[in-house]
Amino acid sequence: MQAMLSSILDEVRPLIGLGKVADYIPALADVPANQLGIAVYGNDGSAYRAGDADTLFSVQSISKVFSLVQAIDHGGETIWERLGHEPSGQPFNSMVQLEFERGRPRNPFINAGALVICDINQSRFAVPILSMRDFVRRLSGNPHILVNSVVAESEAQHGARNAAMAYLMKSFGNFHNDVDAVLHSYFNYCALQMSCVDLAKAFSFLANEGTSAHSGEQILTARQTRQVNSIMATSGLYDEAGNFAYRVGLPGKSGVGGGIVAVVPGQFTVCVWSPELNAAGNSLAGMKALELLSERIGWSVF
């Protein structure tokens, strides 16, 4: 496995320079584009890494999975009264569908859906940002994970569209807390800094029927785990989820920080990171690396 990871990174490295680092969040635009890392964590505790797997990066929309899990843990099936679990087929920050469907987001991984989930968690936790930070520290086994306040502030200064979505949902009665307070939590969740190693470990419960592979803690039930994985498979890569299913064949979640996490149910979790994105907002080299890895080991669930 170790040799394979190194070989795959060598194969995809020529793609660096063909994508574009996210620049609509200024703090992300400054990230050096020539970085590439991958980490694999097994249900048996085995761990492999290559490249810049220990380098911290902004998780961005990958945090939406953590938020969803917190909401499911507290609210169970009741959360689906406020949002769906269907693919959107629209850009992650689109408002057209949200208006047409009267403020009920299609799924928890588009921005509107993630904001509803944050609204749910805002009602539950006294200090949502600290609750999220402590949750990911526990999942990853890394007590040093922090929020990058510069990235969070940068997002807040360029978050008008997210605010518009929140107020639109509030007008339909599907947003209960103060919009600014929820946005503050949301931007801080996205600004969590983690490495490929951290994320592969943190997602291990999704490959292990809801139980963390490194701590033994039950995070979700087996049924809830299948539900989260199914939403990742259909909606986890913005409007490129179908292409990811075709090429990689695994549940996954990406972020505009350049990270992608993929789950091999019953076996492994994988995180790859390269900051340059393709036109859909997903890591260009990361997508190819996961495609090659899945193909060579036969990991596709299809």
From Swiss-Prot:
InterPro entries the record matches: Beta-lactam/transpept-like, Glutaminase
GO process annotations (BP): glutamate biosynthetic process; glutamine catabolic process
Pfam families: Glutaminase (PF04960)
Sites where the protein binds substrate: 61, 111, 155, 162, 186, 238, 256
Gene3D superfamilies in the cross-refs: DD-peptidase/beta-lactamase superfamily (3.40.710.10)
Reaction(s) catalysed (UniProt annotation): L-glutamine + H2O = L-glutamate + NH4(+)
The EC number(s) this enzyme carries: 3.5.1.2
Enzyme class, broadest EC rank: hydrolase
Keywords of the record: Hydrolase
GO MF term (any one): glutaminase activity
Family per record: Belongs to the glutaminase family.
PANTHER family referenced in this protein's UniProt entry, alphabetically: GLUTAMINASE (PTHR12544:SF29)
HAMAP family, per database record: Glutaminase
Subunit structure: Homotetramer.
The protein, known as: Glutaminase
